[in-house]
Amino acid sequence: MNADQVPDQRLRLPDGRTLGFCVYGEPAGMPVVFLHGTPGSRYQIAFAHEVCRGLGVALIAPDRWGYGLSEAPSDAILGAYADDMAALMDHLGHARFCIGGVSGGAPYAAAVAACLVSRVLAVAFVSPVGPIADAGLGPSLSLAHRFNFTVLPRYPGVVTAAFRGFRWSVRRTPRMAARLLTSRAAPIDKQLIARADVSRRVLGSFDEGLRLGTRGPQIDLSIFSRPWGFDLARISAPARVWIGGADRDVPIAAVHALAARIPHCVVTELPEEGHLWVVAHNADVPEWLHAVARASAGLAD
């Protein structure tokens, strides 16, 4: 079965909401939950399907709140996202698991790791959005980052118009959408998105993510702009951050603030890489999570 043949799945949560997800890799393998960026969907991580199948990893990709098949709660409190992931892991029969988040999915991964301490084996943050408000970084941000992360969240109508327009572009003029996506990006990101296979996967994930409308991006931007509401120091699992030195999409200072607040967190800087580096190096994160989880279980490769 290739990545495009992996079936969509749905879970009815205790409060009646639907949670959509896919399981890539080896479904009976070691569980790794990976949370997509902003916007995005369960399809975003499909490029790691073959790598995870080879490792024996069950790569569990949920749609986050308001994206794809997943309905958002009426009151979106970041720490409460851990309850949804606990329900998903219970449904799939996994007592313990690894968690990862890319870009806008990173705060949600942090919430899961901080709130489900006894269940999380390891946590990975890929090109992450960091705790901008907690770290008091607003005044030091670039103009573009200040607008995206502190100003835009105050205007949900503008967010709706922007993401509706972007989805229209994805569907009608995908080349223009790809150029828009990387208008401020590092040259290496522009080279990646110019590849037909990467563009198809990334834009397809965005299109699916916005199928329910723009509630997902509205929630994300609101969460990014305010304190996260939990103590990152509660994370006890091995943690690692990867960030490209040429990444222009997320504030680098917030990435380091995230790592500094998590005990013993390792930072891997990739000097020549941009925001999308994991697309081209899709084995790095699953291999690390797999190795850490096996070590925690006392298993040798």
Residue ranges and their predicted role:
Residues 96-139:
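Conserved hydrolase catalytic core segment
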Residues 52-72:
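Conserved alpha/beta-hydrolase
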Residues 143-230:
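Alpha/beta-hydrolase
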Residues 38-50:
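The serine-hydrolase catalytic nucleophile loop
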Residues 80-97:
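Conserved acidic catalytic loop of the alpha/beta-hydrolase fold
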Residues 264-301:
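Catalytic active-site module of serine/aspartate enzymes centered on a nucleophile-bearing elbow/loop
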Residues 26-29, 36-41, 103:
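Active-site glycine-rich loops that stabilize anionic/oxyanionic intermediates
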Residues 235, 241-243, 247:
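Short beta-strand/loop motif that positions the catalytic acidic residue
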